[in-house]
A protein has these predicted regions:
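Transmembrane signal-anchor helices characteristic of membrane glycosylation enzymes that use polyprenol
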Residues: 1, 15-25, 44-71, 246-258
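Loop-to-helix entry region of an early transmembrane alpha helix in multi-pass inner-membrane enzymes
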Residues: 12-17, 95, 99, 109-132
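Extracytoplasmic catalytic/substrate-binding loops of multi-pass membrane glycan-assembly enzymes
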Residues: 66-80, 87-104, 108, 112-117
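Juxtamembrane membrane-water interface segments immediately following transmembrane helices
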Residues: 72-73, 78, 239-276
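Membrane-interface alpha helices of multi-pass inner-membrane proteins
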Residues: 200-215, 226-230, 245-252
């Protein structure tokens, strides 16, 4: 619908600027108010839960408004590359993500004779993962800083673009969530080198691997982290963890792709961010 398309032009940018100017005094007043209040102990956790409940409510309302979700332009190809044998499965998009998308959408058709039901469950799951990551981020901010930053972070997560992305059939949503968790866990490790116990090591390993599985250029992130860790002479445990994930991803994108008949050749283009 052309009438529903937002035109990104000078007027739109100017409108956004005026909107930010109007919101800014409200944010400043709120920051000054909470700076004057000393909040400790159980009240911190209560305010954290209240902030998350606000985000949860807003996101559920957005989910209902956008129900069953937002179909991206590539979604039809993802569906048909698993449905039809004459269309090869491409590594340009994550085969795992596309396969899960197909599984949910096709299940909606098989069990309810409705594609939208399957897609609604898919977007709900994707949104739940994003909310889980948001909870972890808010908890970290609440534990390490103060309530003011929790409030500001809550306002940030209430921006419409975040929930819209989480309800869109785009691998960027899960990639962003996994990337954020990797960064968060690495920050935890930098603050406390004893953080990487068995449980947290497995958690970091899985989030790193998921980040690379969802988007091919996730390997670039790990390569940069590995290089930085080597220069900073990080502990061997972290170096081995990063190396093992990169090796596993190489096996996944090599022999596993070949075994499953995934067509390669476009992944490098995506990793280099070249136009299609």
């Amino acid at each position: 619908d052309l009438l529903s398309t937002i035109q990104l032009n000078g007027i739109t940018l100017l409108s956004l600027l005026f909107l930010m100017i109007e919101i800014f005094p409200f944010i400043v007043c709120m920051m000054e108010y909470f700076d004057k209040k000393k909040i400790v102990g159980k009240e911190d956790k209560k305010s954290l839960r209240n902030c998350f409940v606000i985000i949860l409510f807003a996101w559920i309302m957005a989910y209902l408004a956008l129900f069953p979700g937002v179909y991206a332009t590539d979604a039809p190809y993802w569906y048909h590359e698993f449905l039809r044998k004459d269309i090869p499965i491409s590594s340009q998009w994550s085969p795992v993500y596309c396969g899960i998308f197909y599984l949910f959408v096709n299940s909606g058709k098989l069990f309810f004779d409705n594609y939208s039901i399957g897609f609604a469950v898919f977007t709900l799951l994707q949104m739940s993962i994003s909310l889980y990551v948001i909870w972890n981020i808010l908890s970290f901010i609440n534990d390490k800083t103060n309530k003011t930053l929790v409030i500001l972070s809550t306002l940030f997560f209430l921006l419409p673009m975040h929930v819209i992305l989480s309800l869109t059939s785009a691998q960027d949503s899960i990639f962003t969530a996994s990337f954020a968790m990797v960064v968060l866990l690495l920050i935890e490790y930098l603050l406390d080198e004893q953080f990487l116990d068995k449980k947290n090591t497995i958690k970091l390993f899985l989030w790193m691997f998921l980040m690379c599985v969802i988007r091919n250029n996730g390997v670039y992130v790990l390569a940069f982290v590995l290089l930085t860790a080597l220069l900073l002479k990080a502990r061997r445990k972290l170096l081995m963890l990063l190396t093992s994930v990169i090796i596993l991803v190489a096996v996944y994108q090599g022999p596993v792709y070949a075994l499953c008949g995934v067509q390669k050749g476009t992944a490098l283009r995506e990793m280099l961010s070249l136009p299609l």
